[in-house]
UniProtKB/Swiss-Prot annotation:
Name of the featured protein: Urease accessory protein UreG 2
Residues that coordinate or bind GTP: 11-18
Chain's gene name: ureG2
One Pfam family this sequence matches: cobW
GO molecular function: GTP binding; GTPase activity; nickel cation binding
Gene3D superfamilies in alphabetical order: P-loop containing nucleotide triphosphate hydrolases
C-alpha cells in the first residue's frame, strides 16, 4: 500500500481551519491529487457536516469523516491520538489510492501541535481579528508548525491590527519557516498556500493527472 501523506491543520476556535480545508480541497483535486478529510469536534461532528455541504459535488461525503473526541482538542491529536489514528487507518483502508489526508483539530490554544504518529506535516492557522500580538506570544503552534497561516487579513483595519507587525513578529518567532496571509472568503493567498503544501508536503505526488469533477 502506498504512503498517504497526513497533514494536520490546527489553530484557535474560529481562526478559519475549516475554511482553509474547504478552499484548498478543490484546488488539490484540480491538480489530480486525491484528498480525504477528517475533522475533530469535542461533542459534535458539526465541522464534518459543514465541509460535506460546502464540498458537495467536489468530494464524496464518505471521504469526509467527523471525529467526536470528547476530550481536549490537543489531547486528541497529540497526547492520545488513537481515535484519529483509527479514523485515518479506516479511511486509508477504504480509499488506498488517495494521496493526502487533511486532519483538522478542534479549536484550541496556541500550544497545539500534532503527534508525529498522526501527522507527517502540520499547518497552524491564526486570524488577524485575534490581534497583532498573537505571533509574538511564543505558542508552539505558531513557532513549530511547518506553515503558519495568518487568516482574515481583510479584517486588519477593523480591529486595529497591523499586518506589518504580524509579519515582523512571525519572522522573528519562526526563523526560516514559511508563513503567509490569507483571506479564505476571497481566495487571496490560497494559491500561495497550495504551492507551499505541494512543495513541502506533497512533492512526491504526481500532479499531472486528468482533472476530475469529483473525487
Amino acid at each position: 500500500m502506498k504512503k498517504i501523506t497526513r497533514i494536520g491543520i490546527g489553530g484557535p476556535v474560529g481562526s478559519g481551519k475549516t475554511a482553509v480545508i474547504e478552499t484548498i480541497t478543490p484546488r488539490l483535486i484540480e491538480r489530480g491529487i486525491k484528498p480525504l478529510i477528517i475533522t475533530n469536534d469535542v461533542v459534535t461532528t458539526e465541522d464534518a457536516k459543514q465541509v460535506r455541504r460546502t464540498l458537495n459535488g467536489v468530494l464524496i461525503e464518505e471521504k469526509i469523516v467527523g471525529v467526536e473526541t470528547g476530550a481536549c482538542p490537543h489531547t486528541a491529536v497529540r497526547e492520545d491520538p488513537s481515535m484519529n489514528i483509527a479514523a485515518v487507518e479506516e479511511l486509508e483502508d477504504k480509499y488506498p489510492d488517495s494521496d493526502v489526508i487533511l486532519i483538522e483539530s478542534g479549536g484550541d490554544n496556541l500550544t497545539l501541535t500534532f503527534s508525529p504518529a498522526l501527522a507527517d506535516f502540520y499547518i497552524y492557522v491564526i486570524d488577524v481579528a485575534a490581534g497583532d500580538k498573537i505571533p509574538r506570544k511564543n505558542g508552539a503552534g505558531v513557532c513549530q508548525s511547518d506553515i503558519l497561516v495568518i487568516n482574515k487579513r481583510d479584517l486588519a483595519p477593523y480591529v486595529g491590527a497591523s499586518l506589518e507587525v504580524m509579519a515582523r513578529d512571525s519572522k522573528i518567532m519562526r526563523g526560516k519557516k514559511p508563513f503567509l496571509f490569507t483571506n479564505c472568503k476571497t481566495g487571496e493567498g490560497i494559491d500561495d498556500l497550495l504551492r507551499l503544501i505541494l512543495d513541502m508536503a506533497l512533492f512526491d505526488v504526481t500532479t499531472n493527472r486528468p482533472l476530475a469533477a469529483s473525487a
